[in-house]
């Protein structure tokens, strides 16, 4: 059984947040506290080390006491750039990734991912959600992967590809379906932030 000490968490806070007017999403208040604090609080009991991927406000993120990793590219290349620098700095066999703007992320995320990863010869496992209409939606930035995939990812990125699902297709992957879709709700616009705050009063 994979123990939590064998898993590092990588919180992805390195995006442009264009739909939020370019504001650094990890530092946007949610019920009075920066979104990054919700991510840390929900992950810290699920894993061993925590890493933060950010490309601005580095001093502020570093004040939380965790290593802050900047993308090696300079053009906000998306979550795979974060995955890459995370694996490069991961000191554990497994890496759990999560965005900074999903303040309700499941507190059993790692545990359920571990069960699925151990159930077969998988390289990685990602989350999916079941909507009220029964439709399954992939949530690929919530992912538990073997940190040994670093070379695979770097080879993929060297081709110029940035799409996360394309990389997954080249690997042995599986998914865990979570019934609580709201747990994966993320904040992309001011309106979504307001709606999520109102729904969680």
Feature annotation, model-predicted:
Residues 2-161, 166-185, 190-195, 200:
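Nucleotide and nucleotide-moiety/phosphate-recognizing core
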């Amino acid at each position: 059984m994979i123990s939590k000490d064998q898993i590092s968490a990588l919180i992805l806070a390195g995006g442009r947040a264009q739909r939020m007017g370019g504001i650094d999403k990890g530092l946007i208040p949610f019920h009075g506290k920066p979104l990054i604090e919700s991510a840390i609080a929900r992950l810290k009991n699920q894993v061993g080390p925590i890493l933060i991927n950010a490309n601005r406000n580095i001093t502020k993120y570093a004040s939380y006491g965790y290593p802050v990793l900047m993308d090696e590219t300079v053009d906000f290349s998306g979550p795979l750039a974060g995955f890459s620098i995370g694996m490069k700095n991961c000191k554990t066999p497994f890496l759990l990734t999560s965005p900074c703007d999903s303040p309700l992320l499941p507190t059993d995320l790692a545990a359920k991912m571990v069960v699925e990863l151990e159930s077969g010869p998988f390289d990685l496992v990602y989350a999916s959600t079941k909507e009220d209409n029964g439709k399954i939606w992939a949530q690929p930035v919530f992912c538990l992967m073997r940190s040994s995939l670093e070379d695979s990812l770097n080879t993929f990125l060297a081709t110029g590809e940035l799409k996360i699902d394309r990389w997954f297709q080249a690997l042995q992957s599986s998914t865990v379906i979570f019934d609580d879709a709201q747990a994966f709700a993320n904040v992309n616009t001011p309106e979504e932030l307001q709606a999520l705050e109102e729904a969680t009063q």
